[in-house]
Amino acid sequence: MMKAVVDIETDSLDATKIHCIVAQHYRTGETRQWVGKECSQFGEWSGKIDQFIMHNGLSFDGPILNRLANARIKPEQIRDTLIESQLFNPVRDGGHSLEAWGNRLDYQKGKLNEFDDYSSEMLEYCIRDTELTRKLGVTLEEEGRTFSSQAYDLERQVRIIIDKQQDNGFAFNLMEGLVLLAQLQDEQYQLEAQANEMFKPTKVQLKTKVKYIPFNIASRKQIAERLVEKGWNPTKHTDKGNIIINEDVLSTIKDMPEAQMFSRYFLLQKRTGLLKSWIKECQDDERVHGRVLTLRTITGRMAHHKPNMAQVPAVSGQYLIRRLTS
């Protein structure tokens, strides 16, 4: 089987141009390079390779080589050292980047700040990355001896599906989202003003003066103190003895309208936070392309960011915002 370690340098993460490609024979270390217009010739050469060893090759290098270098690399041909690193130990100190592995293997990754145009320094940087990926491949072969090939194949297939999900994103009506955000924020401000009328500032006697601490409706500690003053007898506490205040607890206090007001405020906090994150990440195509890390935790659970799509409210929840995503 012909195996090659491959790395590329492009003009950006959303690449429109490949500046250079470097490939090394996995066993012998024999190196080949393609620069500028030569990159279009990579596709013909790549047809001789059975396995491509790349760091983040499934999500980045492979698709870009297929799109811009006339390659026809299949996902099952890619051995992705990023996925292997995450699979074999999801919580490595320092993370799973090639730079982090360079530090571990005492073969530091190069430094390069300018990617807009090709330079000889860029080629040296790419060569260094390829050499480091080769060393990493050997290291992970040894580390992964107790893992089956099926485990890697499964994670590869999951990554492919998630990449499609990220590329597609979901539709988001930005204008309606902005209107709804303004409505919810208006209600928040009204509840804040109402709370300040209900609960006057707390008087604190200092040595030489009196200090007044205004009521903060977002402070769970202050909410607990004021409800206790009104006769509430809390039954749920943290390990440190602090009173637990959340929507579930507040919803059980039926005889205090203040508790229902606080519960409502917490709901509005969550929904406005969610809306702000969606609005921030909405792209020109009017879609939100949330990022998903498939092997982020020791349990194998996925992690989400930009925005956190794991926090979408249930169908039964208030302000589901379904109309904004249809």
Show the residue positions of the predicted features.
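A general structural motif
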Residues: M1, K48-D50
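A generic alpha-helix structural signal
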Residues: G43-S46, L181
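Conserved "right-hand" nucleotidyltransferase catalytic core of DNA-directed polymerases
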Residues: M1-E9, L13-D14, V22, N103-R104, ...
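Active-site-proximal helix-loop-helix substrate-binding element of RNase H-like nuclease domains
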Residues: D14-H19, A23-G43, D50-G144, Y152-I162
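Short loop/turn elements that form and flank the Walker-type P-loop nucleotide-binding site
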Residues: G47-K48, S326
